[in-house]
């Protein structure tokens, strides 16, 4: 079983038209039938020209954008079938660093402080030594 799996994921947006247009509303296909799988510990890079759907696909995987079609699985659980409240419960289990790292990461924080802050957001109380050990374990896991 893949850690992350996308099964024919598509995202279609309605196109903006003028008020006097008599044509049927058009649509823009931002992501068209993407299927992929990522194993635990594997790294995947999305590469493509500007406007090809990389950010839309990433936001869709994070459930910040609903797919028009297809399914997304994380560790075998279908994320696209979750209710909004279930999505909120699962959201701390995955994270995305957006294209502008300065909007996502504080350049004045050390790596330790950044990881510590992420762990603190999960609302689990830890002693100083537990937190230090947890951050060290995370750093070891990512290399």
What are these regions (language model features)?
Residues 20-25, 66, 79-95, 121-124, ...:
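ABC ATPase NBD coupling module
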Residues 47-49:
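The feature captures the beta-strand-to-loop junction immediately N-terminal to the Walker
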Residues 62:
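Helix-to-loop junction immediately C-terminal to a conserved catalytic motif
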Residues 71-73, 77:
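ATP-binding/catalytic-site motifs of ATP-hydrolyzing domains
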Residues 78, 129-143:
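Conserved ABC ATPase "signature" region
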Residues 100, 109-121:
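Q-loop/switch helix immediately C-terminal to the Walker
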